[in-house]
Amino acid sequence: LLTKYPNTYFTTLAIDRFVSVFKDFPESNFIILNSFKHLVDSGRVKIYAFVIMRDHIHIVWQVLGGQSVEDVIMSFKKHTGKLICNYLKDVDRKYLEYFISDRKDREYKIWKISKGNILVNSPNMLNVKIRYIHKNPTKGDYKTVEDSTSYYFSSAKAYSVQSKNFSFLSVLDEVVNGS
């Protein structure tokens, strides 16, 4: 796996204060999807699995071109944070109060500080992380659906029926076939 998929990470990014922005403003999910597409189209990453939950996202992605995962995350969070702020300014300015920053270098803070990048270093770990991502909408406090393939903002359907919902997604045959 390390030679086939080097620099592959399981990453969790959470909204600051765990505000449910993706649930309260479903259009903000498309900001994330479009940003994923941009990262893939620009050759910065390959995305193997993802889920967007009400206040966080999980991704299994491969960082390309000699970049660090931290640089990609910083760029992604800066870009999506700005777009989410602009969107909220247009649709519900009061909601932005949840994100007022106490730092002098920014007015708002959308994302929490990221600490959760785990290098995926085996085929088993890859399968475990992708299954975890796909089951996220069916478990515990985050349960929104019974069947993970019916949750739109996830790669689960692509792994069950080879759906092409998301052009930026690279489906791994090893995971589909369970090997």
Per-range role (PLM):
Residues 1-179:
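Short catalytic/metal-binding and nucleic-acid-binding patches
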